[in-house]
Amino acid sequence: QGGFTAIERVSNILDEPIEIKDQVSPKFSLLENQGSYIDDTIKKLEEQNFITPLALGEIRFENVWFAYKDDDYVLKNLDFVIRPGEKIALVGPTGAGKSSIIRLLCRLYEPTKGRILIDGIDIQEIPQIELRRYMAVILQEVFLFAGDVKSNISLGDNYTSEEIESAAEKTNVASFIQELPEGYNTELRERGTNISGGQKQLLAFARAAIRNPQILILDEATANLDVGTEALIQQALNQLLTGRTAIIIAHRLSTIRNVDRIFVLKRGELIEQGSHQELISQGGLYATLHNLQMLGS
């Protein structure tokens, strides 16, 4: 069940509508049973024959255009490289295209034009199960299902107790779990209503850590912190980011001052990029958004 990761929750939570998928790409229609059977068979053969060459975490968008329908492009001629281990923040107003970039990277959709490569390989050539082992997504709204703690970390994959506990230790969630009535066997309610928002966030980090992904995608994963776990979360996040490529969808610009580069999007176009200080000095859209947030706080 290696394919079941947080990626499968992205389409329910990220902000742009995705119900039109079947209209845009008829090959996904459930009515086309024969085509689906053939596609599934080909996919299984691809997965058997695919030798994983992914190891670095380089992401490359080559002249990527994307429209959910017709020629109404929400991404326009995106052309950039994210180097292995680099931390990038995506910034822009609502509807700028931040979520669409993540959807394409997770292969919830394919580019209308152009291509996306990971470590030099077109992601359309990478079986989804491999892509999802290589990439972890951590969202603002952490989805927990009714079940014990260890199952909420492993998501049904065959990890040992030692591996689960090691992931919990690395992400500062072990001490909280040990205080629960039955430790890792404690039953959580659906959506984790019997634990705090910060504790849910730490469990999401443990989910990512156990899979040891090379690429992390975070949708402002530190947006809803409670005071009791804020320091633990920041420490766990710093450790999780070490040595990995990361893309952060930023809503609070104060949280991304230390990333390597900031990509500023407007109406699907990449209009600015640079460090926090470089973009402030340029006095463009990023500087305007930053100053507005500072005034608001």
PLM regions and their residue ranges:
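ABC-type nucleotide-binding domain
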Residues: D15, D22-Q23, F28-S297
